[in-house]
Swiss-Prot record:
This is Fatty-acid amide hydrolase 1. GO terms for molecular function: amidase activity; fatty acid amide hydrolase activity; hydrolase activity, acting on ester bonds; identical protein binding; lipid binding; monoacylglycerol lipase activity; phospholipid binding. Homodimer. It is a single-pass membrane protein. The gene is Faah. Optimum pH is 9.5. It comes from Rattus norvegicus.
Amino acid sequence: MVLSEVWTTLSGVSGVCLACSLLSAAVVLRWTGRQKARGAATRARQKQRASLETMDKAVQRFRLQNPDLDSEALLTLPLLQLVQKLQSGELSPEAVFFTYLGKAWEVNKGTNCVTSYLTDCETQLSQAPRQGLLYGVPVSLKECFSYKGHDSTLGLSLNEGMPSESDCVVVQVLKLQGAVPFVHTNVPQSMLSFDCSNPLFGQTMNPWKSSKSPGGSSGGEGALIGSGGSPLGLGTDIGGSIRFPSAFCGICGLKPTGNRLSKSGLKGCVYGQTAVQLSLGPMARDVESLALCLKALLCEHLFTLDPTVPPLPFREEVYRSSRPLRVGYYETDNYTMPSPAMRRALIETKQRLEAAGHTLIPFLPNNIPYALEVLSAGGLFSDGGRSFLQNFKGDFVDPCLGDLILILRLPSWFKRLLSLLLKPLFPRLAAFLNSMRPRSAEKLWKLQHEIEMYRQSVIAQWKAMNLDVLLTPMLGPALDLNTPGRATGAISYTVLYNCLDFPAGVVPVTTVTAEDDAQMELYKGYFGDIWDIILKKAMKNSVGLPVAVQCVALPWQEELCLRFMREVEQLMTPQKQPS
């Protein structure tokens, strides 16, 4: 009896001790993880500062040796003229390179867009093949483009101190075409946000107004090119990540069909997700620059280095064609209410196109809520976000991700319950929650089939109207910092074309007027939910900020999409750079 009581007492003590030990271990592990994350952030910022110091010293050295160079005139040259002067010998690659390097260093002070100086670029500068289509052109790279000897952190501590062993395929092709990749630019943590901030490098600001987001996830590219610090850059796009920064920063950007360019060697935080296609594409100040970049990349070098890419060279005759186009258009997708400036931008562009002899036809892709809430959200998070969350173990979560991490960490049953409870008041949020639950392989295959069937239905709808291209609104103006992650529904105008895998590009066409800004007081949104409320507040106080439209074509018709973008650009003349 006594032994039994002693054993019971010891068992109780052991249970308490075990629980305390487990709790202590969890606390220690969390503390250790956070210490590692702090160390990673410290090292990342030290390397960033060292990179910027190296840039500055290189520029000062060059300026001392070349005091008569007219840098300002060089910076105003369109890319096509720049290339012509480089190939003719009128400009030296060194003059162009160090001029843009100095400008990048300068604009970084106000935007925090550069994460790393790709120091061996000076070797590439001396070795660039003169016959290349991009001979001597400095090119900036979104940080996810692997570059030998440099980290691609994606703003995550687990990737700090893990330099790439080789260049990704498109960087190799750029070099073979004579280009000089020179900097990595900032991204939001994990790249799954249309803001641009992370715990390693901090917040990137919009060059037009520092309280506004540059967009994301190619936000560093948008800020750098938009402020004149790079003539050409490469970004990626899985929900609008080229188009948001381009629109918010007043530049042009193209999201091609998913497999038009090689993704081999790109750094990501989730691999194997193919239901919603990732694309990579160019960003620049004008459409001609986008076309030149695409033409340079779609070459034998690319098709040899990555045989999985369809060997489709750039079709110059399609891009240069001048026949009148049949243009579908819509003023709203009835999911995200356009701001007054968005609606005006679309209407004015439509009117200019009609006056130029093109035929404009009302057209709205069918069942957009289904494409967004079921197909896109379900495709991106078919595992319930488990693979995505692996990247955050022991790390800090940046505010730009909003409530995404919290939602993904909820148990599947609780997501379902919460979805049912929210549905009467917040149907959009409820639908997204329900779609972000893990699926079986059988249900994933079914979802992928539904995506393909939806794609075919929109193509059939398009062909029935005999359309060439489509004109749509593009979200804008730029949102306040730290708000994009809390206005998820606003990706509706862009993510639809990732789900469909259609090429889509953006062109700035106007700027926000005082009247546009005043009319935002009347903005209510279509649902009056938290996303609409945040969006209304985030787009205020935007007079003078750029606003774009989106141009869309059918799969593999990038040249036609660019031709349409060029037409829009020529008809509309907004201010090109922040003052």
